[in-house]
């Protein structure tokens, strides 16, 4: 069981993701992205089996309160999982770019291809997932491996050395086949890295 410190980037999907983590048996504490950075860092460093979860949200990573500074402070110290905006923020925090995806996607199901490694082990391939985004990561930093993609768009990443993973799509959506299993395998991968 993980103690998930969940950074809410003021998104309507937050509680779906929180509920999914709780159904999987994990403790979840929610912090808004305008909370006190120092207190959250201290909590993260002093809580056993901590995983920092970065939620979806509107806008860009730079507009999301303490999101980027929090990643900078904790990226070498606690496991991190990001979804949608959280995924984009991790790419940006390590030196990549966030750009317009060329289309606005809201509840679009796409069949992503993945590497069947780490978080995706033994999952359907291609895997139907729900996409809700207009931005995407680009120029992926060398520290990351692309786990999954769709038509050249990065759909999932994992860090080569650190316990960090992220998804552009929404694993918590009912439209994502095996999303619950993907989240559980991600938590296990993060804790055992």
Curated annotation (Swiss-Prot):
Residues 3-193 form the Glutamine amidotransferase type-1 domain. One of its GO terms (molecular function) is anthranilate synthase activity. Gene3D superfamilies: 3.40.50.880. PROSITE patterns: GATASE_TYPE_1. Its EC number is 4.1.3.27. Transmembrane segments: none annotated. It is an enzyme of class 4 (lyase). GO terms for biological process: L-tryptophan biosynthetic process; phenazine biosynthetic process. L-glutamine binds at residues 57-59, 88, 134-135. Pathway: Amino-acid biosynthesis; L-tryptophan biosynthesis; L-tryptophan from chorismate: step 1/5. NCBIfam families: trpG_papA (TIGR00566). Part of a heterotetrameric complex that catalyzes the two-step biosynthesis of anthranilate, an intermediate in the biosynthesis of L-tryptophan. In the first step, the glutamine-binding beta subunit (TrpG) of anthranilate synthase (AS) provides the glutamine amidotransferase activity which generates ammonia as a substrate that, along with chorismate, is used in the second step, catalyzed by the large alpha subunit of AS (TrpE) to produce anthranilate. In the absence of TrpG, TrpE can synthesize anthranilate directly from chorismate and high concentrations of ammonia. This is Anthranilate synthase component 2. It comes from Haemophilus influenzae (strain ATCC 51907 / DSM 11121 / KW20 / Rd).
């Amino acid at each position: 069981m993980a103690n998930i410190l969940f950074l809410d980037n003021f998104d309507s999907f937050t509680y779906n993701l929180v509920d999914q983590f709780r159904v999987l048996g994990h403790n979840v504490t929610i912090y808004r992205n305008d909370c006190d950075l120092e207190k959250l860092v201290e909590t993260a460093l002093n809580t056993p089996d901590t995983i920092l979860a970065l939620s979806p949200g509107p806008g860009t990573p730079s507009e999301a309160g303490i999101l980027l500074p929090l990643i900078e402070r904790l990226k070498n110290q606690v496991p991190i999982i990001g979804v949608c905006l959280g995924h984009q923020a991790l790419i940006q925090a390590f030196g990549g770019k966030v750009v317009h995806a060329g289309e606005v996607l809201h509840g679009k199901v796409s069949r992503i291809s993945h590497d069947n490694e780490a978080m995706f082990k033994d999952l359907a391939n291609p895997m139907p997932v729900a996409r809700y985004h207009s931005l995407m990561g680009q120029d992926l930093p060398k520290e990351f491996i692309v786990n999954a993609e769709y038509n050249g768009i990065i759909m999932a990443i994992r860090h080569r050395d650190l316990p960090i993973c992220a998804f552009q799509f929404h694993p918590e959506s009912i439209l994502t086949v095996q999303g619950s299993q993907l989240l559980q395998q991600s938590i296990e991968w993060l804790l055992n890295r």
